Amino acid sequence: MGGFNLNEMMAAAKQHAEELQKKMAQTVIEATAGGGSVTVKMNGQKQLLSIKIDPEVVKSGDVEMLQDLVTAAVNEGSRRVDQAMQSNLSGMMGGMGLPGF
């Protein structure tokens, strides 16, 4: 009797989730703000790996602007990680043959 086997589906979902976590841990996203004045890199688990700040921004002495640029770059990086996760998740779920993915 073929058909729906919940245990097999759950095992496959767990395997896909583990694969996705590994893939995202190896993914590195770069995002910028202020026309490249601030650049951040973060991995697919949203861990901040590096921040690069153009020395000219620091020389300006405008701390509030620098804070805003760092915040914007980190938020953009986070948004890009979310997009990468969604894209990878959609691809994996589609491979499982589930409707709607």
From Swiss-Prot:
Organism listed in the record: Koribacter versatilis (strain Ellin345)
The protein's assembly and partners: Homodimer.
Chief subcellular location: cytoplasm
Alphabetized Gene3D superfamilies for the sequence: Nucleoid-associated protein YbaB-like domain (3.30.1310.10)
Sequence similarity: Belongs to the YbaB/EbfC family.
Identification of the protein by name: Nucleoid-associated protein Acid345_1974
GO CC annotations, alphabetized: bacterial nucleoid; cytosol
GO molecular function, one term: DNA binding
Cell compartment(s), UniProt: Cytoplasm, Nucleoid
Keyword DNA-binding on entry: yes
Assigned keywords, A-Z: Cytoplasm, DNA-binding
Keyword Cytoplasm recorded: yes
Role noted for this protein: Binds to DNA and alters its conformation. May be involved in regulation of gene expression, nucleoid organization and DNA protection.
